[in-house]
Design a protein with these regions (language model features):
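A beta-rich soluble binding module of mature secreted/lumenal proteins
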Residues: 2-184
Length: 184
C-alpha cells in the first residue's frame, strides 16, 4: 500500500512540474496564433528601441486584431504621440516554416517591413517576447494582452520581464496606467 501511495505522490509531483514548466517551453506556431487571436488590445509594454523624436517618445502602442488566418494578421495599430491618439491599419504575414514562428509586418509607404520572431510565450500572463532586427542589431519587444497588462507592466518580478531580460538589451517602457484611461 505504501508503494502505491508513494507512486501516486511521485506522479502528482511529476505532473505539477510539467505543468509549471509548460509556460517556458520554446514557443511554436500555434502559440503565436493563440496570442494574436483576441479581440482585446495587445499592448507593447517594453521595447529595446526608442520610438519617437528627441524627448517625445511614442506611448501606449497597441494592436487590435481585425482579421486572423493561419497565413495573415490584419490589425489596427494605435499609439499616442504628443498626447494625441493616432491609429492606422497594418498587416503581417505569418510564417511557421522557420525556427521561431514569425510575423512579418508589411512596410508602410515604401519602408521595409519588420520580421518579428516569437521567442517566448507565457500562457498565464498572456505575454510574448518578440525578437527583431533594427539597424543591424538584434532587438526585443514585450507584448501583453489587455486583460493581464496591469500584472505585467514592466515589473521585474514576473516571468515575462525575466524572459525579456534574457535579450540583454535596453528597456524603454511604452505602457503606463494612462494608456487605458486617456482616449486622446
Amino acid at each position: 500500500m505504501r508503494t502505491l501511495v508513494t507512486a501516486f505522490c511521485v506522479g502528482l509531483i511529476f505532473r505539477a512540474n510539467i505543468e509549471c514548466n509548460a509556460a517556458f517551453d520554446a514557443p511554436n506556431f500555434q502559440d503565436l496564433i493563440d496570442f494574436l487571436n483576441t479581440t482585446e488590445r495587445i499592448w507593447v509594454v517594453l521595447r529595446s528601441t526608442y520610438l519617437g523624436e528627441w524627448n517625445k517618445q511614442l506611448m501606449c502602442l497597441s494592436t487590435t486584431m481585425t482579421l486572423l488566418t493561419r497565413d495573415a494578421y490584419e490589425y489596427e495599430y494605435c499609439y499616442r504621440k504628443d498626447e494625441i491618439r493616432q491609429c492606422e491599419n497594418q498587416s503581417a504575414i505569418l510564417r511557421s516554416d522557420t525556427k521561431h514562428p514569425q510575423m512579418v509586418v508589411k512596410g508602410q509607404g515604401g519602408t521595409p517591413g519588420v520580421t518579428y520572431r516569437l521567442k517566448y510565450f507565457h500562457t498565464n500572463y498572456w505575454c510574448a517576447i518578440f525578437g527583431f532586427r533594427a539597424d543591424g542589431k538584434e532587438e526585443c519587444e514585450m507584448r501583453v494582452q489587455d486583460h493581464t497588462v496591469n500584472e505585467t507592466s514592466g515589473a521585474v518580478t514576473n516571468d515575462c520581464e525575466k524572459a525579456y531580460d534574457e535579450c540583454k538589451v535596453k528597456k524603454y517602457k511604452y505602457y503606463d496606467d494612462t494608456c487605458k484611461t486617456r482616449t486622446a
